Each structure stands twice: as structure tokens, then as C-alpha cells.
A protein has these predicted regions:
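A Trp-anchored, charged/polar loop motif used as the substrate-binding/catalytic surface
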Residues: 42-44, 95-105
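N-terminal secretory targeting modules
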Residues: 1-60, 64-78
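Phosphate/oxyanion-binding active-site loops and adjacent basic polyanion-contact surfaces
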Residues: 90-95, 132
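Active-site loop signature of alpha/beta-hydrolase-fold enzymes
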Residues: 66-67, 93, 124, 160
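A short beta-strand-loop structural module common to alpha/beta enzyme folds
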Residues: 82-92
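Alpha-helical cap/lid subdomain in secreted, periplasmic
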Residues: 1, 75-84, 100-163
């Protein structure tokens, strides 16, 4: 009887978990993909910078993060300039692009004290909030695996649209 209960329980669990696993594989927010053109050039420049070492703080994200190089340049210099901070933001990036970049050396051989992550707003036009959260979770997992001593600071996705 105990064996039958275990079999029924395992079958029920499989029926619940399997659709979730299939659904996770169906959306693009978790599938690593590169972009071309200037994006690839910027990605490669990141790899060159981190290869130089001396990285204590890393910012990872999209145009909001990249914006520290434009209008936020003075603030960046004042607060992060002496902190060995590196900006790994690329305008237009979605979770899948950051996943690809992290798999292709953006944080190779560094051990920053903290990684600040803000990504996902560009996914909002084509992914559900749950899918975006899955993409962000993959990024956090990558960082914890590749940078085990680094504190990961996850910032909220800015609200977009009417919903």
C-alpha cells in the first residue's frame, strides 16, 4: 500500500512538474543569444577590460546601465571612479543577451566584491513577467557559479507600459 501511494505521488508530481519544464524551454528569455554589429564590438571591449583585472565592482545591464557613460558620467566618476568599477551595460540588451555574454567571458577571471544587475525591461514587450523572472534567475545563477565570492545586488526592473 505504501508503495502504491509513493507511485501515485510521484506520478502526480511528474504531471505537475513536466509542463513547467516544457514551458521554461519554450520562451526566449532564457536562451543565450548574441547580437551583432556594435554590440559584439562592445562585448569584446568588456572582455579586454576584465582581462586587465583590478575589478572590484561590476554593473551588468542594458541601456539604463550603459547610461552611466553618458549623462551619468559625472556621477559615475564621483561615486564609482575610485572603486575599480566596470560598466558592462549594453543598450537594448535583454536577459538572453546577458546570459550569452556571461557565458562568453564578460566576467572571466575576475572576483569583484559586488555585481549590480539591472536587466529585463527590454524583455517586457515580448515576454511575460514570469519569463522575465526566469531569465533574471538564470543570470543570478550564472553569477553565483562564476563569481562565488561576489555579492549579487539585483535591482528591480523599471515599470513599463500600462500594466
Amino acid at each position: 500500500m505504501k508503495s502504491l501511494r509513493h507511485s501515485i505521488l510521484l506520478t502526480a508530481l511528474a504531471l505537475v512538474v513536466t509542463p513547467c519544464l516544457v514551458a521554461a524551454e519554450e520562451h526566449d528569455a532564457i536562451k543565450p543569444v548574441p547580437r551583432q554589429g556594435g554590440w559584439m564590438t562592445r562585448h569584446q571591449s568588456f572582455n579586454k577590460r576584465v582581462a586587465q583585472g583590478n575589478v572590484d565592482l561590476v554593473f551588468i545591464g542594458d541601456s539604463i546601465t550603459q547610461g552611466w557613460e553618458g549623462g551619468g558620467k559625472g556621477v559615475w566618476a564621483r561615486f564609482y571612479g575610485k572603486r575599480n568599477a566596470v560598466n558592462l551595460g549594453i543598450g537594448g540588451d535583454r536577459t538572453q543577451h546577458v546570459i550569452w555574454r556571461l557565458d562568453h567571458d564578460n566576467v572571466k577571471n575576475i572576483s569583484p566584491q559586488a555585481a549590480v544587475v539591472m536587466i529585463g525591461t527590454n524583455n517586457s514587450g515580448s515576454n511575460t513577467p514570469e519569463q522575465i523572472a526566469e531569465g533574471v534567475a538564470v543570470i543570478v545563477k550564472q553569477l553565483r557559479t562564476k563569481l562565488p565570492e561576489t555579492k549579487v545586488l539585483l535591482l528591480a526592473v523599471f515599470p513599463r507600459g500600462t500594466d
